[in-house]
Amino acid sequence: MKHVHFTDVNLEEPSEEGIKDMKVRWLISKKDGAENFAMRLFEIQPGGHSPLHQHDWEHEVFILDGSGVVKGEKRQETYKQGDVFFIPSMEWHQFVNTGTTVTKFLCLIPYKK
């Protein structure tokens, strides 16, 4: 069993191109023995965003704090605290913080595809 406070996990800067003012904490990952899923906590500063990207795995997102939009190829959806998103594999997406406070969200991704 792993038990840790999220602030004890390193806040890292992702290396992907197209990121602005976004960081991530890998709360649960393979290094913890998790073989099926990773749990990540993202933090996006006001005006910041993830890259517009797609990948061959689905993921599930729970918005903890903040507000903004999730942009897709054909539409965009606003988000606020408490919202949940399912993003299927190969769907273009980008999280943009349009609010005045830090956006924080949990994102779960599979290891097995």
Features from the language model and the residues they span:
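Short beta-strand His + acidic residue motifs that chelate non-heme Fe in jelly-roll/DSBH
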Residues: P51-L52, V70-K71, I87, H93-T100
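Glycine- and acidic-residue-biased ligand/ion/polar-headgroup-sensing regions
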Residues: W57-H59, I63-G68
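A short hydrophobic beta-strand segment most commonly corresponding to one strand
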Residues: L41, F86, T101-K113
